[in-house]
């Protein structure tokens, strides 16, 4: 079967022939429809994030997949069902976090991540997955269901942010998303669909005309250009915000976000920064602001099957124009390299292995 | 009546004569028993925190009070009842946070704090308070009930910390308190009384023999000397911890605490740092650790009537030896200055205005 890999010797994605995997009892053989590409994939390809499976020189790419059950073996799934796989699997014996259904909360070193770190991903004609790492999707999501994974990541961050404020009567009204990549735009879209955030902002560093700015404004949000209005200036230029969602991985944002918050606000950090950057911060002022204004910061990574189910509901309820606008390219395996090209107008791309 | 004030002209506490206040309907006249002294009082006296009431050159000190209802007017209280007052009152018209019973979540500028900022405190033979800012205490707390305020501050921080982890199945086992002052020790005592924290640490910078180290060890916790084991070294020297409670206001602790956390852990910040200290941090590593390990940081200040009620229950259940060990001096008004002296062996002091 076709599979798209990166190898230790060749740091560009290549199409290779791999044997079709055989499902064992308890696992499911899935015929892949589409697999999305995101910033993490580019880091995996560049070798700055993740790693190869043990004893392997190649890694099958892809962690944002949708497919159709080809062989359910003895599981609760039926052939033909639409499914999306979660990303983490135990590295060795499952830890209690896996037993509790929350591998997303597991400690580094206790898991592999399919298509990212230590385990082959889903960019192949077929893949297998344990049934408990698969979530059924409604038929309406056949086209855009590969967005379930990134939407689930945003769902989890929003859940953690709201939970952090659940000890008191909190009535957020405004939110700011840092980043207008696909994860930032999906987070913004989820917030726009919620009742509790009337006023939305999204920060980027692009000039008009730009398709992401069009999406931001069509969602009813205000675009903020970080080149003219840095994060720390947002309260003065616009307003202090109840929630910040950091979706760029730019490390200074994690600290500036504290200043952008209204009293009792929360900053959720989704973007993963590179290691090793040391810089000055107004340390005691940030600490003071956290304490005296009851602010919170929550980090959030990955997502579990529960978040995938919530994401499927969310995705099914998002307006059609939105996914059409965010998904700027779906490329079949013959043209797979186009899915890994970052263009001025590209937002989210996917490789298509098959159609329903 | 007797009152203990600090004045713009004289930055040492003085005993003065003040007229006894008259309660208006809806408010209660309280005969003061004891008022505690904490670090905030010392900052108020030094002029580094808080401020005088509008148009006044003197501030009555004290925000940790217990007293007896002298005149309940038309309120739900009865004469003779033991009560503790909360600290914040509206500055001008009450904001929605006051209407919701959570002045502790109010924005700076919308409140005054009795004995701290813009309103006279409780260090007087009598004070008045709106009934909704008073909490009834059981008779058993007549001696140590002035600790209700600091215990309520710790209760709130613990509540916010736990809430921040409530979106998933979290099973904390270890906690680290930074600071062995009275707030740190009370926080440690509350954690020791809970079922969910088997392993406790408390960090200070004192040498044995020391009464705070004795308390820490009698509570079953391990004392960590920050001069030999800085916060960031605690995971290697002891273990990564599920919770950190920062009760010193030392700004670097707020950042080092992130490194001390186990995956999915939370750092609660209670101590209030001075403003204006800028320093270098391993910014992207901290950001990365927050995200990849799902860590949280929550700031917490003040407390509301609900936290006072929880604190009264907590305080009533603490072992007798503990409050006896923490309260190192109760001084009557004739010797009030002793309550403001910080000695090697003093932990928590109070001024006694009257006895039950």
UniProtKB/Swiss-Prot annotation, chains A, B:
Name of the encoding gene: gdh
Binding site for NADP(+): 180-183, 205-206, 270-272, 300-302
UniProt KW Nucleotide-binding keyword: yes
GO BP terms, alphabetized: non-phosphorylated glucose catabolic process
Residues engaged in binding substrate: 40, 113, 149, 302
Keywords, comma-separated and alphabetical: Carbohydrate metabolism, Metal-binding, NAD, NADP, Nucleotide-binding, Oxidoreductase, Zinc
Family according to the record: Belongs to the zinc-containing alcohol dehydrogenase family. Glucose 1-dehydrogenase subfamily.
Top enzyme class: oxidoreductase
Region of interest called Disordered, as start-end residue ranges on this chain: 1-26, 86-107
Described purpose of this protein according to its UniProt entry: Catalyzes the NAD(P)(+)-dependent oxidation of D-glucose to D-gluconate via gluconolactone. Can utilize both NAD(+) and NADP(+) as electron acceptor. Is involved in the degradation of glucose through a modified Entner-Doudoroff pathway.
Catalysed reactions listed for this entry: D-glucose + NAD(+) = D-glucono-1,5-lactone + NADH + H(+); D-glucose + NADP(+) = D-glucono-1,5-lactone + NADPH + H(+)
Gene3D superfamilies for the chain: Medium-chain alcohol dehydrogenases, catalytic domain, NAD(P)-binding Rossmann-like Domain
Protein name: Glucose 1-dehydrogenase
Biased composition (Basic and acidic residues): 8-21
Known cofactor(s): Zn(2+)
Keyword Acyltransferase: no
Coiled coil: none
EC number: 1.1.1.47
One Pfam assignment: ADH_N
Superkingdom of source: Archaea
Gene Ontology MF terms: D-glucose binding; glucose 1-dehydrogenase (NAD+) activity; glucose 1-dehydrogenase (NADP+) activity; NAD+ binding; NADP+ binding; zinc ion binding
Binding site for Zn(2+): 38, 63-64, 149
